[in-house]
């Protein structure tokens, strides 16, 4: 697909600078874009690349456009505008086209108009697949699961029974939705499994990354709100509730029955303990361990940043001496008070 700068400007509500009839076929970085591509400047540290870019046109803020003589689309937020254009010019192939003859579809399943199901997919009893869904090769959809319209499952996604997905969701390869939660009772050292009888409920416009796992609820459902984005290899434990438009980066773990608020951001390789409530608008830095409730929005961190190894070793030794140092300071304070 190709669009002129004028057409893109109308789509974005942008002001066009330069040749309105220039045809754009795709997007690219300032450093690598060619004359038929659109790029963007969203961070001033890349301003030097703007001066030498070969891009046919650039998405710019009003401030940056004052110093640029080339073709441009002037917008409020260049990065968001870039995302919109990238969506419009997207050439990603479909996960499936038509219904492959090797797909195994239960007679009781309901398949919406225009839905596509790839090779060797398995659709269980009572499944409802909405209009224009794409089910990639090798996917398994368990009994009584529901997919809203325009939802896309890439190859080898597994949905257990009673998993509900909203509209316009994207689930990447290897994701498993609805597996058993980690629920056991301990009887004198022996683990007794607790059947996980709940389901999974996922809202509209949710994207779930490759090899991510969302466990089903023990009693009641695990819930993921509208607009949530989960990166690759994220673990959502049973009965967790993820508020709408929250983002969780790769390798993070949300333990069971934790309620994570709306519009939160969880950095990569973070862990949030179970049975906690996290307020709306909380930003957890990468590598952070959250072990208690967070009641106010803001940024929270616990990880130690990388330093030169020799310094790290010295600091580690000092950390192990911290309790002794505390006791010595406490004794000195006591002696000082006695002298006073």
Curated annotation (Swiss-Prot):
Listed HAMAP family: LpxD
EC number: 2.3.1.191
SUPFAM superfamilies associated with the record: Trimeric LpxA-like enzymes
Keywords carried by this UniProt record: Acyltransferase, Lipid A biosynthesis, Lipid biosynthesis, Lipid metabolism, Repeat, Transferase
GO molecular function, one term: N-acyltransferase activity
Metabolic or biological pathway: Bacterial outer membrane biogenesis; LPS lipid A biosynthesis
Subunit-structure text: Homotrimer.
Top enzyme category: transferase
Native species: Shewanella denitrificans (strain OS217 / ATCC BAA-1090 / DSM 15013)
Catalytic reactions of this protein: a UDP-3-O-[(3R)-3-hydroxyacyl]-alpha-D-glucosamine + a (3R)-hydroxyacyl-[ACP] = a UDP-2-N,3-O-bis[(3R)-3-hydroxyacyl]-alpha-D-glucosamine + holo-[ACP] + H(+)
Gene name of this polypeptide: lpxD
Active site per UniProt: 238 (proton acceptor)
Protein name: UDP-3-O-acylglucosamine N-acyltransferase
Gene Ontology CC annotation, any one: membrane
Family recorded in the similarity comment: Belongs to the transferase hexapeptide repeat family. LpxD subfamily.
Pfam families: Hexapep (PF00132), LpxD (PF04613)
NCBIfam families associated with the record: lipid_A_lpxD, PRK00892.1
GO BP annotations listed: lipid A biosynthetic process
Function: Catalyzes the N-acylation of UDP-3-O-acylglucosamine using 3-hydroxyacyl-ACP as the acyl donor. Is involved in the biosynthesis of lipid A, a phosphorylated glycolipid that anchors the lipopolysaccharide to the outer membrane of the cell.
